[in-house]
Amino acid sequence: MLRVSENGLRFLLKCHSTNVSMFNRLLSTQIKEGRSSIDDAGIIPDGTINERPNHYIEGITKGSDLDLLEKGIRKTDEMTSNFTNYMYKFHRLPPNYGSNQLITIDKELQKELDGVMSSFKAPCRFVFGYGSGVFEQAGYSKSHSKPQIDIILGVTYPSHFHSINMRQNPQHYSSLKYFGSEFVSKFQQIGAGVYFNPFANINGHDVKYGVVSMETLLKDIATWNTFYLAGRLQKPVKILKNDLRVQYWNQLNLKAAATLAKHYTLEKNNNKFDEFQFYKEITALSYAGDIRYKLGGENPDKVNNIVTKNFERFQEYYKPIYKEVVLNDSFYLPKGFTLKNTQRLLLSRISKSSALQTIKGVFTAGITKSIKYAWAKKLKSMRRS
C-alpha cells in the first residue's frame, strides 16, 4: 500500500489539476491561432473532441504538441490509482474538489430529507438520499402514490448505531432485534455490508434506510469490491451529511465510471460519442448481473428512464469529470481493473452481492415487509408512462 502524507496527496491533486488546466489553455491557444480548424461536422482535426448541440462527438489521434501534457496527466492518474488507503482521514481537500457532488434540490424536498435524517438519535458520519423518491424517473404515472424515500446512513460503529436505534425505533426492525445489536451488526456484514429497514414511517414518510459502516462504504467506492454502493453513488444522489473521505474517493469513483462509459459509448457507436448514451452507460454499470433484473423486480427500461428525467443532473454531477475524461482523455480505474477485465469482474461481484443482499433482506425486513417490498417493486417495474 502506498503511503503518502496529506500534503503530498494535495500536491498530487494540484498537479493533476494544473496539468489539465494547462492542457485546456494550450488547446485553446492552438485553436485560436489557427493551428487547428473545426470542420462542418464539429470535429477538431488535431484529435481533441468538440461537443455538438446534439451531444455527438468524434475523435481523431491527437497532435504531438499535446503529448507532454497528456503524459503528465496520465502519470498523475497512475499515481492516484496507486493510493489505496481508503481510511485515510482528510482534514481538507483542494478548493472545489468534488463540489460537483453537492447537488441542490427542491427546498421542500430538502426540508423533508433533512427531517428524516435528523430524526435518528444514533450518530451518522455520512448520509445520502437516492432513487425515485429523491430524483424523479420517467416512465411512471404521477397518479401513483409518492415513492418510498431511500437513504443510506454511513456510521462509524454499526453495533452502537443499532443499539441506540433499536431503543428509539424498535418497530423498524424485524425479529432479529431480539438477538441484540451486536448480532445485527454482524449480520449486516453479509453480502454488501448494508442492513436495510424498509417501510419505516418517519415524519409521515415511507422510508427505506440502509446502515453501513464507513469502512465498508469507503472500501467499496475506492476498490469496487462489491460495487453495491459504488454503483449507487455513480448516479446523482443527494448528500445530506458529507464526509471528506467519501467526497475524495467518490470523485475517483465517478471518474472511473466515466472512463468505462466513454469506452463503451465509442465502442458501440463506431467511435462516435453521444452524451446521452454516455450517461446511460454509467447508469447501466450497477445493474449488470443484478439478480433483481433476472427476477423481474426492476423495470427493464429503468436505465433509460433515470437518464431521461435526470439528464441535466447527470451533467451537473459529472461536469468536471466530463471535461477530464471525455474532453481531455484522462483515464482512471481502481487498482486491478482494466478496460478488458472490468465487465467480467463487475458482473461477478454484482451478481454475488445483489443475491446475498436480496436473501438477507428477507431476514432484516421480516416476511411481511419483504413480501410488501417485493410486490411494490414488481408493480413499479410494470408501470409505463
From Swiss-Prot:
It is found in: Mitochondrion inner membrane. Transmembrane segments: none annotated. InterPro entries: Tam41. Pathway: Phospholipid metabolism; CDP-diacylglycerol biosynthesis; CDP-diacylglycerol from sn-glycerol 3-phosphate: step 3/3. It holds the Pfam family Tam41_Mmp37. It catalyses: a 1,2-diacyl-sn-glycero-3-phosphate + CTP + H(+) = a CDP-1,2-diacyl-sn-glycerol + diphosphate. Its main location: mitochondrion. Optimum pH is 7-9. Keywords: Lipid biosynthesis, Lipid metabolism, Magnesium, Membrane, Mitochondrion, Mitochondrion inner membrane, Nucleotidyltransferase, Phospholipid biosynthesis, Phospholipid metabolism, Transferase. It is a peripheral membrane protein. Changing residue 8 to S: In strain: SK1. Disruption phenotype: Deficient in cardiolipin. Blocked in the import of presequence-containing proteins as well as of non-cleavable carrier proteins into mitochondria. GO terms for cellular component: mitochondrial inner membrane; mitochondrial matrix; mitochondrion. Its EC number is 2.7.7.41. Its cofactor is Mg(2+); Co(2+); Cu(2+). One of its GO terms (molecular function) is phosphatidate cytidylyltransferase activity. Belongs to the TAM41 family. Present with 195 molecules/cell in log phase SD medium. Catalyzes the formation of CDP-diacylglycerol (CDP-DAG) from phosphatidic acid (PA) in the mitochondrial inner membrane. Required for the biosynthesis of the dimeric phospholipid cardiolipin, which stabilizes supercomplexes of the mitochondrial respiratory chain in the mitochondrial inner membrane. This is Phosphatidate cytidylyltransferase, mitochondrial. It comes from Saccharomyces cerevisiae (strain ATCC 204508 / S288c) (Baker's yeast). The gene is TAM41.
